[in-house]
Amino acid sequence: MKAISVLGSTGSIGTQTLAIVEDFPDQFRVVALSAGRNLSLLVSQIQRHRPDVVALADQALLAELKDRLMALPADTRPEPLPHLVGGPEGLDVVASWDSADLVVTGIVGCAGLLPTLAAIRAGKDLAVANKETLIAAGPVVLPELKKSGSRLLPADSEHSAIFQCLQGTPWSDTARLSTGVPTPGLRRIQLTASGGAFRDWSAADLEKATVADATSHPNWSMGKKITVDSASLMNKGLEVIEAHYLFGLDYDHIEIVIHPQSIIHSMVELADSSVLAQLGWPDMKLPILYCMSWPSRLETPWRRLDLTEVGQLSFRAPDPAKYPCMDLAYAAGRAGGTMPAVLNAANEEAVAQFLEEKIHFLDIPKMIEGACEQHKPDLAANPCLDDVLAVDQWARQAVREQVNRGTRLRGASMAA
């Protein structure tokens, strides 16, 4: 039985991970959980899974969590109560919990970086749904992986598809991820993208895009931030950078293809020009399960793919004019160093500002480009962890300042 630690247990990835544990009680058990502020859901997860340790990102909520657990009926209250920890140190405890065999990282954004590093330094294998860890800190993470022997297993559908395709090659032993060197025999990666909420919109129509529009994904059920990233295609741009670090390919050999049906999750072209693809319904539980069961596969009762039901699979090239975030991501990846960290942080902040309706959808790439341009003179080619954390905070502030300037300008214009 494999012992699982879940970072971000109340989020989309975390809840799906725990659902898998419930589907396979003879294969997995939960030993550690971390969460943000959703105490009601967390309490129910503790009741059901009885972990050894639980961490809250906000240490101030620990007393309330303990009170809620103590108030449970005696027949449903875990005995003994889990060890409760809080703050960044608490997240590190969950990430490096001694009995955990696999750490599932479902914390959204750069907030997942430090606990992911803690897990790596503890020698844990990781199921990585937090793509920002490699994007922002690839030059920091790869040496730590080499030092500890940890393995990163991709829990997002696209990189899981690539990983699964490579398991069928003679060099699959070298495709265990995150060595930072090219995977032998791998010529090209094609990352498929649904096109997001605006795939059937014209570039001109995006002027009137609302938050509700951007957070309505046609195929996948995801959190708001990543759904907006899908609408802007930034999610795919970030995945290009992640694929570069995971599989060692140059950016010129990692392509994005719009595939509206979201049935092919990605493709690899091998040295002999063969192309391998992984197919399945758009369901995040499949790549998460593969991470959890790897190198084995578990039989599931889940819905099986019927291509006659799908009818057709279509593909088209993405329009750079409609998706400017895509080119920004390629440029940041090629610049390397601290630039991907700036790109990632600026995007996180710009999306947050959009979700609060402080900026328009088309302002998101403008804010990101502004931060990246400002950072060019200060780019660190070989960053350490402190460099990454510093530029992360700087980029967020740079976006906030752009938003504030724009607000003041709009206010002055209206007054005139």
UniProtKB/Swiss-Prot annotation:
EC annotation from Swiss-Prot or TrEMBL: 1.1.1.267
Single annotated GO MF: NADPH binding
InterPro entries found in the cross-reference section: DXP_reductoisomerase, DXP_reductoisomerase_C, DXP_reductoisomerase_N, DXPR_C, DXPR_C_sf, NAD(P)-bd_dom_sf
UniProt feature coiled coil, ranges: none
Pathway where this protein functions: Isoprenoid biosynthesis; isopentenyl diphosphate biosynthesis via DXP pathway; isopentenyl diphosphate from 1-deoxy-D-xylulose 5-phosphate: step 1/6
A Pfam family hit: DXPR_C
Amino acids binding Mn(2+): 156, 158, 239
Cofactor(s) listed: Mg(2+); Mn(2+)
Keywords: Isoprene biosynthesis, Manganese, Metal-binding, NADP, Oxidoreductase
Catalytic activity: 2-C-methyl-D-erythritol 4-phosphate + NADP(+) = 1-deoxy-D-xylulose 5-phosphate + NADPH + H(+)
Enzyme class: oxidoreductase
One GO term of the biological process aspect: isopentenyl diphosphate biosynthetic process, methylerythritol 4-phosphate pathway involved in terpenoid biosynthetic process
Residues the entry annotates as binding 1-deoxy-D-xylulose 5-phosphate: 131, 157-158, 194, 217, 230, 235-236, 239
UniProt: NADPH binding residues: 10-13, 36-38, 130, 132, 223
Family: Belongs to the DXR family.
UniProt xrefs under NCBIfam families: Dxr (TIGR00243), PRK12464.1 (NF009114)
HAMAP family listed in its UniProt record: DXP_reductoisom
Its biological purpose: Catalyzes the NADPH-dependent rearrangement and reduction of 1-deoxy-D-xylulose-5-phosphate (DXP) to 2-C-methyl-D-erythritol 4-phosphate (MEP).
Record's protein name: 1-deoxy-D-xylulose 5-phosphate reductoisomerase
Gene source species: Synechococcus sp. (strain CC9311)
Source taxonomy: Bacteria, Bacillati, Cyanobacteriota, Cyanophyceae, Synechococcales
